[in-house]
């Protein structure tokens, strides 16, 4: 509730007449104990109240009621009766809330939103206040009644409509409602005006006597008077400070006034110096014109030199463009040669592999045939030798006549046959072991080749794993700082750039990395755009070469020697993007790199256009469609190349696959990339484990085969030794001269059989030799073909190596020429800017010359010859002006000094008058406040005594006694009640009373406050809930008696009783509430903070 107007405190005569008479009686007695009041049952005023009482209330969707009212209240006593839940308390709550009270003041909820019926969007309250008679509020606007309508939304906000008697909306501002309540002296947050059952319970059970005192002060509005007094005293102290400041200012003004008066007496003429000053000004005007003319001539000379230099730079740029075209043509020619060689090499690779496989197969077939032939040859030689020995032996036997040693010879012959069979078996075993050794050697060679291949694959997979792990770390770091995608040092480098820019080391702050300054319109094109821009995504832009040198020095701190640094692009910063509409590529279905990017910074867009011509590069997601657009038909106009979603680069006649499989810098879905990388890393780790297992298995196979090979070789040696030993023994036996008789016929048969075997072996050997020769020729033919194709491939490789070196040199040359061209373009641009600046300066100087000449003619129409410079004349003018000012300072101008003197005197007199007025005001205010404070203290004592007497008188009607002790110094109030006779029971705190006794005492206390408090209506909720029948009847009689004596006030009493025993009177109106709907027993409240209610209010 807003403060009352100050005149309410300053004008005691505005109070009600009865109170004024009582105060005068109190002043006459002079002592509180002697102050008496007469209680009468007669009516003090028989007229009904004209302003401020409640005429009607109507509720909609309020608390748990869809519609209540309208309730028409009488002008005096109104009983609202009904069972619990019927809406009695809702009417009282609506009265408090509807007249601007806060939700917490109702003790029914902590937020306005809790008063909206469950399931509804809003609630409405309509209260009609009486507005008649002489004290009506803006009667010409509102009429005889004021309708206050409040709309409460479900979110806790509320709005007001203040309507006239005719229903016209007069205002929607809360300030208007506060003015109405102040005018009618209505305080809805004053518990004396509206006392809820919960407020009464809290007050009477409060242990803090200071709270009761505050209750009393607020109910009687003494608290408001006290606050008004304090405010006036603070205002008085501030006014005293203003008076003290004014007195200090008066002293200073008086001193200044005397000084002005003294200076006025010492004024002298200064005409000669003023004449000289005017002549110097004439010379100064034309001296300025002379200097501007000299500056114009110098600027014209500079422009002429600049135009010649611009033409020279144009020629150099044309020469540089020719060199760049030659370098690009050379690079393209070498690149075409390399591509042709690469295509031819790739085309011959499958044939080479097939021929190599054929050579290996034919070599193996030839070796097998050669082994068979050698074996047959050895067998033939052995048979031949055996035949020769048999023939020799037969001859020897035929000559021998001695048959005595025949048994020994036969034994030797038998031994020889056995040894030969053993040699034959050993030779077969030798052949088998030799074949096994060859198989082991081939297996070892094959395993070693496989081991080398797997080992190489393992190294490649490990390199890829390390790269993926670094990429994963960068991605995880980029989740917290996206800039780390462009390198781990980038955030620190950007901080260093910011710091250097703050220290003004840069002309313009460098921009970069460029990848952080662009955004994709289509995330699926991320890899394509990265493949196109490559290192430019990590590049930085500088305005000039001075900024580039500063940035290079900063980069040295973060990029160690030997490591690659980001590229720096030097180009003057512009605020607008280049107009590329005439040279940009266009396709109705596919965007260019420029249109596929969102680039907010014009410098970034211009740099990418300069360095990569992104307006001419198309982006086509599908590979086959890209080939069709660029190669199967004529490429779109102005389109040089295209990139696919897989990062492949497509030219009109070439196609290059991308080395990358995923974007590194421009991907938006970092979590998905991290997940994919983690999966790929796990797969690679699993692959490495598989490769390691494969390597281990191959190493075991190689070791096992090598051991088996050693065993075979050792076995082979042992067999060889056995064969040599047996052959040696056979030869020894055959060389022994046998003189024994032998069976010549048997030997001859054996010789014949040996001859037949020799023929068979010879025939077989000839076939094997023929087969071997055929296989040899086939092997040689395959080797020749393989060597031929291998030689061609090696020749192509030898041709490609110098071409690669030439391509690198040509690429460097192209970059060098581009930098050279960019250098001249930058210089030309910088020079043209300077030249244009000079031209603009020339225009400005010409305009300035015209202005200065016009000004000079106004000062001196005839041009005069000036020999002194403008600076010298300026110094002379300043010296003369200072001399004149010094004379003015010592003497001054008469009119000016007179004017200053009059102003100082008037200021002094005005301030002196104000200070005197304030002094009189403060003196009068102190006298008034002293009198008013005494009156306030007397008024407080009178109200205190009246409250005590009313309380005692009301308690005595039930044979109770009570005490009210006021301590105004400590601001406390203590209340005690004695239920029985004064000498039969002791005084007790009200909390010790029974429910009925406490309720009765509460009514007595409230009636006491009602008797001394000002308010057009009083509301009391369930005042008799704890009373027995006797106390209820007595309390009712007391309330009706008071109401009858105060017909100018309205009483609204809420009770669950039927009130059927009330006397019949036109002053009493009973409003009966309908019983609540079945099941409706609680209200839909929920806890809300105090701040919500305050904000809603």
Curated annotation (Swiss-Prot):
<dbReference type="GO" id="GO:0035061">
    <property type="term" value="C:interchromatin granule"/>
</dbReference>
<keyword id="KW-0158">Chromosome</keyword>
<dbReference type="InterPro" id="IPR027417">
    <property type="entry name" value="P-loop_NTPase"/>
</dbReference>
<keyword id="KW-0539">Nucleus</keyword>
<keyword id="KW-0832">Ubl conjugation</keyword>
<feature type="compositionally biased region" description="Basic and acidic residues">
    <location>
        <begin position="1"/>
        <end position="21"/>
    </location>
</feature>
<feature type="cross-link" description="Glycyl lysine isopeptide (Lys-Gly) (interchain with G-Cter in SUMO2)">
    <location>
        <position position="274"/>
    </location>
</feature>
<dbReference type="GO" id="GO:0044828">
    <property type="term" value="P:negative regulation by host of viral genome replication"/>
</dbReference>
<dbReference type="GO" id="GO:0000722">
    <property type="term" value="P:telomere maintenance via recombination"/>
</dbReference>
<comment type="similarity">
    <text>Belongs to the SMC family. SMC6 subfamily.</text>
</comment>
<dbReference type="GO" id="GO:0016605">
    <property type="term" value="C:PML body"/>
</dbReference>
<feature type="region of interest" description="Disordered">
    <location>
        <begin position="813"/>
        <end position="839"/>
    </location>
</feature>
<keyword id="KW-0227">DNA damage</keyword>
<dbReference type="GO" id="GO:0016607">
    <property type="term" value="C:nuclear speck"/>
</dbReference>
<feature type="region of interest" description="Flexible hinge">
    <location>
        <begin position="458"/>
        <end position="667"/>
    </location>
</feature>
<comment type="subunit">
    <text>Forms a heterodimer with SMC5. Component of the SMC5-SMC6 complex which consists at least of SMC5, SMC6, NSMCE2, NSMCE1, NSMCE4A or EID3 and NSMCE3. Interacts with NSMCE1. Interacts with NSMCE2. Interacts with SLF1. Interacts with SLF2. Interacts with RAD18. Interacts with SIMC1.</text>
</comment>
<feature type="coiled-coil region">
    <location>
        <begin position="232"/>
        <end position="348"/>
    </location>
</feature>
<keyword id="KW-1017">Isopeptide bond</keyword>
<keyword id="KW-0234">DNA repair</keyword>
<dbReference type="GO" id="GO:0006302">
    <property type="term" value="P:double-strand break repair"/>
</dbReference>
<dbReference type="GO" id="GO:0016887">
    <property type="term" value="F:ATP hydrolysis activity"/>
</dbReference>
<feature type="region of interest" description="Disordered">
    <location>
        <begin position="1078"/>
        <end position="1097"/>
    </location>
</feature>
<feature type="cross-link" description="Glycyl lysine isopeptide (Lys-Gly) (interchain with G-Cter in SUMO2)">
    <location>
        <position position="779"/>
    </location>
</feature>
<dbReference type="GO" id="GO:0051984">
    <property type="term" value="P:positive regulation of chromosome segregation"/>
</dbReference>
<dbReference type="Pfam" id="PF13476">
    <property type="entry name" value="AAA_23"/>
</dbReference>
<feature type="region of interest" description="Disordered">
    <location>
        <begin position="1"/>
        <end position="32"/>
    </location>
</feature>
<dbReference type="GO" id="GO:0097431">
    <property type="term" value="C:mitotic spindle pole"/>
</dbReference>
<dbReference type="GO" id="GO:0031625">
    <property type="term" value="F:ubiquitin protein ligase binding"/>
</dbReference>
<feature type="coiled-coil region">
    <location>
        <begin position="376"/>
        <end position="457"/>
    </location>
</feature>
<dbReference type="GO" id="GO:0005524">
    <property type="term" value="F:ATP binding"/>
</dbReference>
<dbReference type="GO" id="GO:0000217">
    <property type="term" value="F:DNA secondary structure binding"/>
</dbReference>
<keyword id="KW-0547">Nucleotide-binding</keyword>
<protein>
    <recommendedName>
        <fullName>Structural maintenance of chromosomes protein 6</fullName>
    </recommendedName>
</protein>
<feature type="coiled-coil region">
    <location>
        <begin position="668"/>
        <end position="920"/>
    </location>
</feature>
<keyword id="KW-0779">Telomere</keyword>
<dbReference type="InterPro" id="IPR038729">
    <property type="entry name" value="Rad50/SbcC_AAA"/>
</dbReference>
<dbReference type="GO" id="GO:0090398">
    <property type="term" value="P:cellular senescence"/>
</dbReference>
<keyword id="KW-0597">Phosphoprotein</keyword>
<dbReference type="GO" id="GO:0000775">
    <property type="term" value="C:chromosome, centromeric region"/>
</dbReference>
<dbReference type="GO" id="GO:0000803">
    <property type="term" value="C:sex chromosome"/>
</dbReference>
<feature type="modified residue" description="Phosphoserine">
    <location>
        <position position="675"/>
    </location>
</feature>
<comment type="function">
    <text>Core component of the SMC5-SMC6 complex, a complex involved in repair of DNA double-strand breaks by homologous recombination. The complex may promote sister chromatid homologous recombination by recruiting the SMC1-SMC3 cohesin complex to double-strand breaks. The complex is required for telomere maintenance via recombination and mediates sumoylation of shelterin complex (telosome) components.</text>
</comment>
């Amino acid at each position: 509730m807003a403060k009352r107007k100050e005149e309410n405190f300053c004008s005691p005569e505005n109070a009600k007449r009865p109170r004024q008479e009582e105060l005068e009686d109190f002043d006459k007695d002079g002592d509180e104990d002697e102050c008496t009041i007469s209680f009468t049952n007669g009516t003090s005023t028989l007229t009904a109240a004209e302003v401020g009482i409640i005429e009607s209330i109507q509720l909609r969707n309020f608390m748990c009621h869809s519609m209540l009212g309208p309730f028409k209240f009488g002008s005096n006593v109104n009983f609202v009766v009904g069972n619990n839940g019927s809406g009695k308390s809702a009417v009282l709550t609506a009265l408090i809330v509807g007249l601007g009270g806060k939700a917490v003041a109702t003790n029914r909820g902590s937020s306005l939103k809790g008063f909206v019926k469950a399931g509804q969007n809003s609630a409405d309250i309509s209260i009609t206040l009486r507005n008649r008679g002489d004290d009506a509020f803006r009667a010409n606007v509102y009429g005889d009644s004021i309708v206050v309508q409040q709309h409460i939304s479900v979110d806790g906000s509320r709005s007001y409509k203040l309507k006239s008697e005719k229903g016209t909306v007069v205002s929607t501002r809360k300030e208007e409602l506060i003015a109405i309540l102040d005018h009618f002296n209505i305080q809805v947050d004053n518990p004396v005006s509206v006392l809820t059952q919960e407020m009464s319970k809290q007050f009477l059970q409060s242990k803090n006597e200071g709270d009761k005192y505050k209750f009393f002060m607020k109910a009687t509005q003494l608290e408001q008077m006290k606050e008004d007094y304090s405010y006036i005293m603070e205002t008085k102290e501030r006014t005293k400070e203003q008076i003290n400041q004014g007195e200090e200012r008066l002293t200073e003004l008086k001193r200044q006034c005397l000084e002005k008066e003294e200076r006025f007496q010492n004024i002298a003429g200064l005409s000669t110096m003023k004449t000289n000053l005017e002549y110097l000004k004439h010379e100064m005007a034309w001296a300025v014109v002379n200097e501007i003319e000299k500056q114009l001539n110098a600027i014209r000379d500079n422009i002429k030199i600049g135009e010649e230099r611009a033409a020279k730079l144009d020629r150099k740029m044309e020469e540089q463009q020719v060199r760049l075209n030659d370098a690009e043509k050379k690079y393209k020619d070498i690149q075409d040669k390399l591509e042709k060689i690469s295509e031819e090499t790739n085309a011959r690779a499958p044939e080479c592999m097939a021929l190599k496989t054929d050579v290996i197969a034919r070599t193996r077939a030839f070796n097998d045939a050669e082994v068979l032939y050698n074996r047959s040859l050895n067998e033939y030689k052995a048979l031949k030798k055996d035949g020769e020995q048999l023939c020799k032996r037969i001859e020897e036997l035929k000559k021998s006549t001695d048959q005595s040693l025949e048994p020994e010879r036969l034994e030797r012959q038998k031994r020889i046959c056995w040894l030969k069979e053993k040699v034959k078996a050993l030779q077969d075993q030798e052949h088998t072991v030799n074949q096994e050794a060859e198989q082991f050697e081939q297996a070892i060679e094959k395993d070693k080749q496989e081991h080398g291949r797997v080992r190489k694959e393992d190294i490649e997979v490990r390199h890829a794993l390390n790269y993926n792990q670094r990429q994963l770390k960068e991605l995880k770091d980029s989740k917290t700082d996206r800039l780390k995608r462009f390198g781990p040092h980038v955030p620190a480098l950007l901080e260093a750039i910011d710091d250097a820019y703050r220290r003004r080391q840069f002309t313009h702050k460098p921009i970069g990395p460029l990848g952080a300054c662009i955004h994709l319109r289509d995330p699926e094109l991320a890899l394509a755009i990265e493949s196109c821009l490559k290192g430019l995504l990590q590049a930085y832009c500088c305005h000039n070469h001075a900024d580039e040198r500063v940035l290079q020095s900063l980069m040295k701190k973060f990029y160690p020697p030997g490591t690659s640094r980001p590229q720096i692009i030097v180009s003057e910063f512009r605020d607008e993007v280049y107009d590329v509409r005439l040279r940009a590529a266009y396709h109705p279905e596919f965007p260019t790199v420029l249109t596929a990017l969102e680039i907010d910074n014009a410098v970034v867009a211009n740099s990418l256009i300069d360095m990569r011509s992104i307006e001419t590069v198309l982006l086509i997601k599908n590979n086959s469609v890209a080939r069709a657009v660029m190669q199967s038909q004529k490429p779109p106009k102005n389109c040089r190349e295209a990139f696919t979603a897989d990062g492949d680069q497509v030219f009109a006649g070439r196609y290059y696959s991308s080395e990358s499989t995923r974007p590194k810098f421009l991907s938006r879905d970092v979590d998905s990339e991290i997940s994919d990388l983690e999966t790929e890393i796990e797969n690679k780790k699993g692959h490495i484990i598989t490769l390691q297992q494969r390597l281990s298995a191959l190493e075991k196979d190689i070791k096992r085969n090598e051991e088996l090979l050693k065993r075979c070789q050792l076995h082979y040696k042992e067999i060889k030794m056995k064969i040599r030993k047996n052959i040696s023994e056979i030869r020894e036996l055959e060389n022994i001269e046998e003189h024994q008789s032998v069976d010549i016929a048997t030997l001859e048969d054996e010789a014949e059989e040996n001859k037949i075997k020799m023929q068979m072996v010879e025939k077989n050997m000839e076939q094997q030799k023929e087969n071997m020769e055929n296989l040899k020729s086939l092997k040689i033919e395959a080797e020749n073909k393989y060597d031929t194709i291998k030689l061609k491939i090696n020749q192509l490789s030898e041709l490609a190596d110098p071409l690669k070196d030439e391509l690198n040199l040509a690429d460097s040359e192209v970059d060098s020429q581009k930098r050279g061209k960019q250098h001249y373009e930058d210089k030309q641009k910088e020079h043209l800017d300077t030249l244009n600046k000079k031209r603009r300066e020339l225009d400005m100087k010409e305009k300035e010359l015209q202005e200065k000449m016009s000004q000079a003619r106004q000062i001196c129409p005839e041009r005069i010859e000036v020999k002194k410079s403008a600076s010298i004349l300026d110094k002379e003018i300043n010296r003369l002006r200072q001399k004149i000012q010094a004379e003015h300072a010592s003497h001054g101008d008469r009119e000016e000094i007179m004017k200053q003197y009059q102003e100082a005197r008037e200021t002094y007199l005005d301030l002196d008058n104000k200070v005197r007025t304030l002094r009189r005001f403060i003196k009068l205010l102190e006298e008034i406040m002293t009198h008013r404070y005494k009156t306030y203290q007397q008024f407080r004592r009178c109200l205190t005594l009246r409250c005590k007497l009313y309380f005692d008188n009301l308690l005595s009607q039930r044979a109770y006694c009570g005490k009210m002790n006021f301590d105004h110094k400590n601001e406390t109030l203590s209340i005690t009640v004695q239920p029985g006779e004064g000498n039969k029971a002791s005084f007790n705190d009200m909390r010790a009373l029974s429910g009925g006794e406490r309720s009765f005492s509460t009514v007595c206390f409230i009636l006491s406050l009602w008797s001394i408090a000002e308010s057009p209506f009083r509301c009391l909720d369930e005042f008799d809930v704890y009373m027995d029948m006797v106390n209820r009847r007595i309390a009712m009689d007391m309330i009706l008696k008071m109401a009858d004596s105060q017909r100018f006030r309205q009483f609204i009493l809420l009770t669950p009783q039927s009130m059927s025993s009330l006397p019949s009177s036109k002053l009493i109106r009973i409003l009966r509430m309908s019983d609540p709907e079945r099941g409706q027993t609680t209200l839909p409240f929920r806890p809300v903070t105090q701040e919500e209610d305050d904000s809603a209010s």
